[in-house]
């Protein structure tokens, strides 16, 4: 039976949106495994816009949903429409958009909040005990979704791991090619570009994450 998987994007571009490589690798693996995918994003303004050639902030405003549609080839919906009962699993790629648009973790660290529509959607999967995959920096959302005690990884960055621990998560160090699973909560995480030095290194862990998330839907 074909599995239906929701993917929440956070814009388009590593410095101010969804990490494009991570997003495409996840979407490709889902397609290779025969899953039916629907992309979602919050219909809100980005925190800011970054020139990806220089790293400088640009004097303009962009919409997270509109930018995410670039990755989704236009096939995208407002995350307000995302209901866990319509899907078997959820995956959230990383990129600074997860920490600037889906949440304010990049600014507020352990005292961050998650965008309300994103939080409601993700908690729906947690409450339904359906599998969730969080990639790269998006495990920063884990404690807000699941509460204290959730196990997850962002690789081995001490500062970020400390912030996750302060939020109530149990951080587990992880190689770029591996995954960490919280079996009780059906949460799977992988470091991807928190550690990856190439797209193939990122793909190694993301492919394992997608495969495991799909296994957990059975």
Regions found by a protein language model. Give the residues of each.
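A short, charged/proline- and glycine-enriched loop
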Residues: 1-3
